[in-house]
Regions:
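Short, charged, intrinsically disordered terminal tails
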Residues: 142-144
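Conserved binding/recognition cores within well-folded domains
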Residues: 18-122
Length: 144
């Protein structure tokens, strides 16, 4: 029965495609449930990717700030780079040089202004994607 469901999703009955689908699904499930240790300025923080809403670079302090879904903010260690943050989850995308968002909370992107809207409780947040980062963000999304 399980294989029949997979056949419909994969649009074929080739066992090779079914196995590829299973391994892709397993990697996505692992990526979303995995906890990552992140060094803040005051402690070692263990977080799941879905608990992170966004990261912003503070020009004044030259530190990345990680904003959690519950609203708490953590200042990350000075050596933390955007590349390190993006490596936490495939759902993280850099929308500007100083901002990284979790695509799980992205609801839409306006075509011309590149204004982002987010799903609740972040529907009041305002963010814009830079033209430079837009292509990379689109590549991470499954666009029909």
């Amino acid at each position: 029965m399980e294989d029949a469901k997979l056949n419909v999703i994969v649009l074929g009955n080739d066992p090779q495609y079914i196995q590829k689908f299973r391994s892709a699904l397993a990697s996505v499930q692992t990526a979303t449930s995995k906890r990552t240790a992140i060094q803040t300025v005051s402690k070692l923080l263990l977080v799941k990717a879905e608990d992170v809403f966004a990261c912003n670079f503070d020009e004044e302090c030259h530190l990345w700030n990680m904003r959690m879904v519950d609203g708490t903010e953590y200042k990350l260690k000075k050596q933390t780079t955007a590349k390190m943050i993006l490596g936490i989850s495939p759902y993280f995308a850099q929308i500007r040089q100083d901002r990284i968002i979790n695509l799980e909370y992205l609801a839409s992107i306006e075509n011309y202004t590149l204004r982002c809207t987010f799903s609740p409780p972040f529907d009041q947040e305002e963010a814009f994607i830079s033209r430079r980062c837009y292509k990379a963000v689109k590549e991470k999304l499954e666009i029909l």
